Amino acid sequence: MSTVVVKGNVNGGVQQPRRRRRQSLRRRANRVQPVVMVTASGQPRRRRRRRGGNRRSRRTGVPRGRGSSETFVFTKDNLMGNSQGSFTFGPSLSDCPAFKDGILKAYHEYKITSILLQFVSEASSTSSGSIAYELDPHCKVSSLQSYVNKFQITKGGAKTYQARMINGVEWHDSSEDQCRILWKGNGKSSDTAGSFRVTIRVALQNPK
């Protein structure tokens, strides 16, 4: 008879704690489900992809092949104490064929944005004299007018010109010269002076 009493109280008090446990587990499962089902990590990944796409579009916003920037280096060797001459920067720059006969002919417009003029001394310690130099930003003079700036032939030196000083802010037609540097030595014709080393940075646009 004891077994009959146990089975007869299923709706009484014997099975009821198990129901409460199951109900409690369901409530806990329901509380956990929002955390499991909300996949918030997917949204930041989509935003990162969009930012990455924006960065790529900025890098490719300017079409390639429409402009170029180049650096050229050339030298003027075997200068004597009384040597004189000039560098005309543009299509007349015969001392730098790679620029004059090369890339300059491939573009309609250019501008030289900086010029580094270096004098490398090769003179003996007993030599005397200097080499004066002058910037003509508009190619208006053909001979040295000023002797203010000088390189001592026994020491050497360097001078840098930026774009605003050399008429290099605006674009120039590739058939026109931009500026000129003139120089003249006051030493002896028998004395070895040295050489010039010139570095120019050039921007080009509108290819032919």
Swiss-Prot record:
For molecular function, the Gene Ontology terms on record are: structural molecule activity
Task: Spell out the subcellular localization from the entry.
Answer: Virion
Q: Give the keywords, sorted.
A: Capsid protein, T=3 icosahedral capsid protein, Virion
Q: Where is this region: Disordered?
A: 1-69
Where primarily located?
virion
Pfam families given in the database record: Luteo_coat
Q: Which family does it belong to?
A: Belongs to the luteoviruses capsid protein family.
What functional role does this protein have? Major capsid protein that self-assembles to form an icosahedral capsid with a T=3 symmetry, about 23 nm in diameter, and consisting of 180 capsid proteins monomers. Most of the 180 monomers are the major capsid protein, but a small percentage contain the minor capsid protein, which has a long C-terminal extension.
Q: What is known of its domains?
A: The N-terminus like those of many plant virus capsid proteins is highly basic. These regions may be involved in protein-RNA interaction.
Name listed for the protein in its UniProt record: Major capsid protein
